[in-house]
């Protein structure tokens, strides 16, 4: 499953374009005000693997190494011939402009679920678990309603 960190990264508090990342958990935020709000609920333990890696790195400046497997699998997915699995640019814009979707994303619990899903190692397992949560199902249904409106109306 592709990472959610593509070109649509938004501030975890106000959903605006972020300028910074939390030093503890690496979630994006756009201002001091948003950082202060985030800091109240920040859980630095959401990134324990990164902490271990950083503590094992030498103290001199080293360019971070990208996860080659993730890059390859994303590239394979993007280059696949399965056009029906791709979301058009127009539908991506529609997702970004949806007031309903934006209001759902204001929920801190849903946002934490999304961060956990994005950062989790077993995304398929997390997705199965999250699809048991009514809030996440509402979010998924909203996204599908925007991306595939005709299929949603038939069911």
UniProtKB/Swiss-Prot annotation:
Its main location: cytoplasm. SUPFAM superfamilies: HIT/MYND zinc finger-like (SSF144232). It comes from the Eukaryota. InterPro entries: BCD1 (IPR051639), Znf_HIT (IPR007529), ZNHIT3_C (IPR048371). Zn(2+) 1 binds at residues 11, 14, 30, 34. A zinc finger (HIT-type) spans 11-42. Pfam families: zf-HIT, ZNHIT3_C. GO terms for cellular component: cytoplasm; nucleus; pre-snoRNP complex. It is found in: Cytoplasm; Nucleus. GO terms for molecular function: nuclear thyroid hormone receptor binding; zinc ion binding. Zn(2+) 2 binds at residues 22, 25, 38, 42. The modification Phosphoserine is found at residue 80. GO terms for biological process: box C/D snoRNP assembly; maturation of LSU-rRNA from tricistronic rRNA transcript (SSU-rRNA, 5.8S rRNA, LSU-rRNA); regulation of DNA-templated transcription; snoRNA localization. Keywords: Cytoplasm, Disease variant, Epilepsy, Intellectual disability, Metal-binding, Neurodegeneration, Nucleus, Phosphoprotein, Zinc, Zinc-finger. It is linked to PEHO syndrome: An autosomal recessive syndrome characterized by progressive encephalopathy, lack of psychomotor development, severe intellectual disability, early onset epileptic seizures, optic nerve/cerebellar atrophy, pedal edema, and early death. Thyroid receptor interacting proteins (TRIPs) specifically interact with the ligand binding domain of the thyroid receptor (TR). Requires the presence of thyroid hormone for its interaction. Interacts with NUFIP1. Interacts (via HIT-type zinc finger) with the RUVBL1/RUVBL2 complex in the presence of ADP. This is Zinc finger HIT domain-containing protein 3. It comes from Homo sapiens (Human). The gene is ZNHIT3.
């Amino acid at each position: 499953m592709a990472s959610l960190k593509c070109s649509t990264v938004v501030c975890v508090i106000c959903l605006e374009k972020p300028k910074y990342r939390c030093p503890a958990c690496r979630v994006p935020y756009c201002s001091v005000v948003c950082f202060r709000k985030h800091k109240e609920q920040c859980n630095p333990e959401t990134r324990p693997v990164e902490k271990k890696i950083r503590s094992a790195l030498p103290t001199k400046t080293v360019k971070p190494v990208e996860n080659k497997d993730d890059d390859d699998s994303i590239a394979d997915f993007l280059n696949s011939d399965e056009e029906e699995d791709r979301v058009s640019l127009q539908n991506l814009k529609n997702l970004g402009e949806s007031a309903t979707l934006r209001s759902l994303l204001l929920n801190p619990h849903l946002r934490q679920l999304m961060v956990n899903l994005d950062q989790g190692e077993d995304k398929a397992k997390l997705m199965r678990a999250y699809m048991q949560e009514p809030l996440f199902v509402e979010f998924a249904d909203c996204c599908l309603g925007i991306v595939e409106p005709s299929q949603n109306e038939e069911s």
